[in-house]
Amino acid sequence: MVFVTIIIIINISYNIYNIYTINENRFTFNAFLQSKKASFTFICIYVCISGGNMPLWAYILFRTFLHPSSSSNSVLCFRRHNQDYHNRIFFAFCCHHIWSLLPHHLSIFPIRRQFYLNSRQ
């Protein structure tokens, strides 16, 4: 948990620095939210809040659906996806929570499956 917190702090600092330099030495929170690098920050925060209990497919879903213009590294090129950006974050969160509510997903992870079987006895 401490390691994840350190990664979050480093990542947010790095993102702020990047956006500060891209926007001619001005930092705006809106530009941070629209940057591609912000997605990793959201992933780190979510993993930290959920105690690290996030399946790998949810991470892949985040990386796939969050970046419609994956070849672009510019914040300015990402502005046209502003509305989609929040919808895709919401979609990824919903998919993960629906998946975590299903009991059959425990059979995919052997440790969690054993814990699930022991708790039912």
Swiss-Prot record:
Q: Where in the cell is it found?
A: Membrane
UniProt keyword Chaperone present: no
| Keyword check for Ligase | no
Q: Which topology term describes how it sits in the membrane? A: Multi-pass membrane protein
Entry keywords, A to Z: Membrane, Transmembrane, Transmembrane helix
**How is this protein annotated for GO cellular component?**
membrane
Q: Which residues cross the membrane?
A: 2-22, 42-62, 89-109
The chain's disulfide connectivity reads none
Q: What else is known?
A: Partially overlaps PRM6.
What this protein is called in its record is: Putative uncharacterized membrane protein YML047W-A
Q: Which organism is it from?
A: Saccharomyces cerevisiae (strain ATCC 204508 / S288c)
